[in-house]
Amino acid sequence: NKPEALVDYTGVXNS
């Protein structure tokens, strides 16, 4: 479980 991946999906959602 990597937090970086979570932020990656969060940025997409934000877009």
Curated annotation (Swiss-Prot):
One of its GO terms (cellular component) is extracellular region. Has bactericidal activity against Gram-positive bacteria M.luteus, methicillin-resistant S.aureus, methicillin-sensitive S.aureus and B.stearothermophilus as well as against the Gram-negative bacteria E.coli and S.typhi. Keywords: Antibiotic, Antimicrobial, Bacteriocin, Secreted. One of its GO terms (biological process) is defense response to bacterium. On the 2D-gel the determined pI of this protein is: 7.0, its MW is: 10.7 kDa. Its main location: secreted. It comes from Bacillus subtilis. This is Bacteriocin BAC-IB17. The keyword Secreted applies. It comes from the Bacteria. It is found in: Secreted.
